[in-house]
Amino acid sequence: MSEENEFVGEMGAVAAETAIAETNRTYAGAPEQAAAASITRGEANPPTEAMASAAVCAHSGDTCESSGDRLQPKCDGAAEVRDIACDVVIVGCGVAGLYCALNLPSTLSVVMLAKTTVDECDSMLAQGGICVQHDDADYASFFEDTLRAGHYENRCESVDLMIRASRSIISDLVKRGVDFERDKAGNLRYTREGAHSRPRICFHSDITGDEITSTLLARVRELPNVRILEHTCMDDILVTQAEAQVNAENAAKNEAAVQSGTTQNATNVENQDCAAHDAAAPATPRGGDSRQPRTRCCGVLAHTADGAQLRIFAGQTLWACGGIGGTYPRSTNFPSLTGDACTIAARRGIALEHMDYVQIHPTSLYSTRPGRAFLISESCRGEGAVLLDANGNRFTDELQPRDVVSAAIYRQMVAEGSEFVRLSFANMPKDEITGHFKNIYKRCLEEGFDITREPIPVVPAQHYFMGGVRVDRNSATDMPGLYAAGETSCNGVHGKNRLASNSLLESLVFAQRAAWDMCRKLGAKAPVAQTYPEQPCGADAQAYERLCAEAKRKTRENAAKCGPQNTTQTCAQNVGQNTAQTEPRSAEQPGSQTPAQTCPQNPSPSDTDRTASSKEVVCA
């Protein structure tokens, strides 16, 4: 490796030397052969046809080019190959990636990749805020709100961890310089959004994501052990040898599962043919599992805007590269978010989960301009904005879960033959509009609408992906050495439909847990200690048992009412009562009906609850 191309920390050197030797031994040594063997040529096997056109980079041409708003990577397989070594490589520079880096010690070398620029991430776009457990009494209601919004398909273990970690996360953000809104007494202000039973959302005007992400990015830029590479697109992961047979087998199972409509894909399975290799396998890179698994991630393969290929060897790898919105014609996401990690996972036989769980946000600004849809925050409705039909009448309860409100809007549009409905701010004081929602106010003026004087046209748009790469409570995938966090991952927090303002919190909590687990694997001490017990205690434990039992009961009832597992079957009359019952709004709701909903799947067999063991937990 040339000195200018390496980034080796004190611990990274050991991992790099072992991984490079292992990779070269696997791929016969030549860089070109290594690159060729590491990437599947031609068409990938993406989870959906929508991803096939814009997910993992195809290798043809010689430079990375931009076509409109969508990145069109073009790489020459015979281009220069540069080797980089580090302890941890993080793919993505949103809040999950940044917070993981901040929770790693300075003794570890870290490389972060941004597909375009560091500020082109969906974390920057989050408007409404970030949830927090308001007080001790809020645990059960926060938990139940999350379950109701998710149609009780949530993984209870993950919901519990997120809620109990929330206050320490907010405190840490404040210490790092995040400026949340406060009242005159200096206390945090809270707003409310759809399906929340009480205000529990911290915010910064209507640009909370920008405030959090920009602050974390500034802190990361101060770290001498972190290197950020912009305009660097991940093509594949690097793995140790003996992968071919097992991963090809699992990739075929994944593809078959997707084609058959099964949402939980095949995981790595035991293969007796690999036993001989396991016994004779060389030592794994630093940070590897002591059991020496037959297949282990040891970094990523990527390419840069100048056409160079990068082999980034790392002891631990984190995928934090966002969702799939770039594959949709109308989305609030950046066009560069095209499900790259999910496509690689499908090809590599890494478990995926709930690939059909896509959230449609009820209110994006209707516009004939091309490009990303502009989100109208749900907190607008939480503060009093209402949806109106063509006659100026309300037609639904605006504070129901997002999927319910989106369905109601769609039905209204069909009934009217219209391309949008209207959102009125008439119930909101002007200073609240221009203060709390100043960014939305400004953007609407650019489109010719003054929201202090008139309703604005809104339409549903793809917004969030609840599925993704399946991970455990520490954000680890089923491939050793590989983690996933943020919208890339599926830890089960959101169930079938995400509760408003849970995305930033979930990303931060589980990115931090990934960092802690990496530190354990790398033998390093995390700079921020865990402040909450691994399992709920006292009143929280009792609420946890009750809510998990309720979730199991609801999923059994829904499965019985809706028939066999069929995630596309509509069952409005049977499932309609499972949505959150928000407090009544003062205005009448002419024409409102129970929205159609999609029947939930049966609970995943691996969605284990701790109800049996929670009484034995020793509380910290």
Question: Where do the language-model regions lie?
Answer:
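Conserved redox-cofactor binding core of oxidoreductases
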Residues: 175-246, 285, 289-308, 313, ...
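Extreme N-terminal leader/targeting segments of oxidoreductases
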Residues: 1-88, 106-107
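Core beta-strand elements of the Rossmann-like FAD/NAD(P) dinucleotide-binding domain
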Residues: 84-86, 307-316, 478
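An anion/pyrophosphate-binding glycine-rich loop and adjacent beta-alpha core
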Residues: 118, 344, 350-456, 517-519, ...
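Glycine-rich loop(s) and the adjacent beta-strand/alpha-helix scaffold that form part
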Residues: 316-370, 374, 502-513
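N-terminal Rossmann-like FAD-binding beta1-loop-alpha1 element of flavoenzymes
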Residues: 88-112
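Glycine-rich active-site loop/strand segments that organize a redox cofactor
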Residues: 131-162
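Glycine- and aromatic-enriched mobile tails/lids
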Residues: 57, 69-86, 117-119, 124-130, ...
